[in-house]
Amino acid sequence: MGLLQDKFAKYDLPQQFMAKGVYPYFRTINSHQDTEVMMDGKKVLMFGSNAYMGLTYDKRIIDASIAATEKYGTGCAGSRFLNGTLDIHVELEKELAEFVGKDEALCFSTGFTVNEGIIPAVVGRGDYIICDDRDHASIVDGRRLAFATQLKYKHNDMEALEKELQKCEPDAVKLIVVDGVFSMEGDLANLPEIVRLKKKYNASIYVDEAHGLGVFGKQGRGVCDHFGVTEDVDLIMGTFSKSLASIGGCVVG
């Protein structure tokens, strides 16, 4: 056994929780995702699902998925840069941009990789990234990869956000990154006030709509639409694994 294996050989905390019957992870579901699911041979209520609109078991979605698989197969067999861009990708990106109310969209394999990829692509050394201290872990990873100066403010505290903006060089790029709906707290970002501060300090705004898309706004256009600030938000991220009953993510702007 090597050093890596030795490191974890005595780690038995999960087993301790399992023995007490309180280990909450990797519970196996034996049915489709619905308000009730089958688990360990029993029907139980589902309180943890992100399928906010129930589309994961909608027959129209299932039929469209089957039709697409029969036409295109189960994979793209290449990256988007080379041979992995399908006509339905281009069509989807156009429709996403139109739906949210922006010019362009770009799809990713997951919502997590949107934040990991886009944030370091748009800010870097010499720039500032200002985040709510309750932002999602994918935003945390994205900002770490960016090599920009990282500033954090107390959750939804607009006075604290303004103080962080005042620390930034006036002529530097300043990107405020915030969850539209905070996944742990369940509250909304104060986007109207964030937009006001953006304009005052010549900053830009990136909103993670993972939990807002499909739920808030006109026809589910998200928290930005809910507050009427879509035009003032520079980049909007969304994920397909929640309301949209699939897998993947996108950024629109």
Language model regions located:
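Active-site phosphate-binding strand-loop segment of PLP-dependent enzymes
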Residues: 151, 155-207
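Active-site PLP attachment segment
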Residues: 225-253
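N-terminal "arm"/small-domain region of PLP-dependent enzymes with the aminotransferase-like
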Residues: 5-74, 203
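Short, small-residue-enriched loops and turns at beta-alpha junctions
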Residues: 54-55, 82-85, 137, 158-159, ...
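Conserved N-terminal alpha-helix of the aminotransferase class I/II PLP-enzyme fold
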Residues: 63, 67-111
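Conserved PLP-anchoring active-site segment centered on the Schiff-base-forming lysine
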Residues: 118-137
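Short, structured coil segments at secondary-structure junctions
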Residues: 101, 125, 145-147, 201, ...
